[in-house]
Amino acid sequence: NPNHTITVPGNAGQVISTGGYNVANGGLYLDSGRGFTLSGEVKPDFCAPAVNVYGPGLRNRFVTMTGTSAAAAITAGACAQIMEWGLVKRNQIFMSSADIKNMLIRGADRADDRSYPNPSWGYGTLDVAFEDLRR
């Protein structure tokens, strides 16, 4: 079924699952996993940049990468920023992984022409510069 392509471990309940999109044209990355899960849970949770993502490569070079692995790396970086805000800067010292997931979902940018959550975009696109983290 082309609308249920997220598999283990991405379809597990407590994990953060990210789809991918093309920042240049705003479109969904063709090979991005789609949900919802067969049990009805929203997956992906949101989408992150996945096409022509510029980042570190081998031998001290920078390269462009395409794929949801790039989107997952960006999402991991966002999680690290939230953990720093919560734990290191002591804004939320009892932060859990569920708290991080909820912050990412709550902060996701939602396009006006889509309904959310949906099986392609989840709750929107990754955006960690949202108001709750600035307090």
For every predicted segment, state its role.
Residues P2-A80, F130:
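Extracellular S/T/G-rich loop segment that most often corresponds to the catalytic His/Ser-adjacent loop
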Residues G35, R90-N91, G122-G124:
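Glycine-centered flexibility motif
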Residues V51-Y116:
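Hydrolase catalytic cores
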